């Protein structure tokens, strides 16, 4: 499938399914997050990790692949900025984002691998769960583009996913066995959603931390930390209120805080911070 066709498929899914509200403030895309009370504190604290790495105050924050800015913690990233620039491939996402932040935002339909902005115009850039929807050939260009549009010395902060990382592989074995026991027919929209969920149809392959550092380090400094070390499948399968679910997640969060680079490398979702290389000029 050509790159343009892959991007069109992603746009179609989010315009027609993913960013359609199924109830007040809850989107169809909520299937990709664990919104149960037992997981809420852990999820919210992970969302808040982004804010540690962006500039606390600035003029312009770019939210690349903003979606509808669907979680309260996401809204807080731009609290001390004059404007939040929301860029997304989905017009539905941007309409929902406008409903949430109004005049605080500017809204642009665009491709994060070809940002329509001049060099060095943003005080910080954030991008959550967007790069993995791109064709694989666009992954490194997307990182470079987000670095390009930040001001010198300012951070771009991205959350993405690894390809079957060790911790997920270890913990998910029982769940995957159970899933293989299940059968059922899917309609067309469910098939598209499944492709996006499993990372098929949106790129040819994923990668690991070593590969990403190798590809990016020639252009910029890269720090890989933990955003969240377990995925939604793990949370829904293992975490139960009556089996000390909250306590287990508090323990997991504490370990992530103690060893952020370890869990960022072996866990599900890394928090990737890129900035200018020290003592060097941009290419």
Residues of each region from the PLM?
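A conserved beta-strand element that flanks and buttresses the S-adenosyl-L-methionine
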Residues: 126
